[in-house]
Amino acid sequence: MALCALTSALRSLSLASAAITARVPTLLPAAQIQSNVLLQLPPALVSPSYRPVHMSADRSAKFVSWKSRTKYTVKPVKMRKSGGRDHTGRIRVHGIGGGHKQNYRMIDFLRFRPEKEKAPEPFEEKVVVVRYDPCRSADIALVAGGSRKRWIIATENMKAGDTILNSNHIGRMAVAAQEGDAHPLGALPVGTLINNVESEPGRGAQYIRAAGTCGVLLRKVNGTAIIQLPSKRQMQVLESCTATVGRVSNVNHNQRVIGKAGRNRWLGKRPNSGLWQRKGGWAGRKIRPLPPMKSYVKLPSAAAQN
């Protein structure tokens, strides 16, 4: 009697489990479900055998869309934040994230850029407006000349209504340049305060572009110019490289008071870990010689001269 009761209980348990399995959707692959005769489920309940994955090419296409613009425009361009991630989606910089929405304004760092229809000769432009730029520490200025407008880095005392000169001429005598004018280094007198300096002629400004910074034209030697950077390091470039006269705008940028941690989050800066680190030999000031002069002049080697 006990054996018959146990057999009937097991038979009822197996039938109940089969009924429950038929009612509940399964997560088995589609090929295995179709081969099983006992489970006849509708196609809508059959789960696919893979999960769609976003490829890195799709991410990179969306990530650099606002950077890959080839046509210049003075209109603000919508900017996509990276969050410290590269094109694969992995975090590369942990201190970047969040922040207020920003629009990118294309800055023309090549000051001497004559229009296509005109000959390459000095030309003047008028400052339309000087405004704040969320993507950099310095202020920017909208200048107009001829049939075009463009954004440039504003100097310290630049204001709307000013007229600036852009030249590529190097004369026998040094010019009496005004603040905001752009001239080759060979045309400026020694001791001039400069900013937005080119490393190679026609490449565009690459040095001294931060707010409140300026360099000094120390001397001119054999067709080259020696410049002192804000870090006190000296740099040698060709005298045909263009520079802007004066000091970069927003001089009090380094004296601003953040006031609270939330303002850094507005700027897109994430908090640090807060881990205490013992101050070792890397901390504090040290007496060390200045680094050697950086040269962008490709002089012929001694072997080539011999």
UniProtKB/Swiss-Prot annotation:
Designated name of the protein: Large ribosomal subunit protein uL2m
Gene: Mrpl2
Subcellular location: Mitochondrion
InterPro entries reported for this sequence: NA-bd_OB-fold, Rib_uL2_dom2, Ribosomal_uL2, Ribosomal_uL2_C, Ribosomal_uL2_RNA-bd_dom, Translation_prot_SH3-like_sf
Organism: Mus musculus
Record keywords, A-Z: Mitochondrion, Ribonucleoprotein, Ribosomal protein, Transit peptide
Pfam families noted in UniProt: Ribosomal_L2, Ribosomal_L2_C
The keyword Transit peptide appears for this protein: yes
Organism classification: Eukaryota, Metazoa, Chordata, Craniata, Vertebrata
Predominant localisation class: mitochondrion
Summary of subunit composition and partner proteins: Component of the mitochondrial ribosome large subunit (39S) which comprises a 16S rRNA and about 50 distinct proteins.
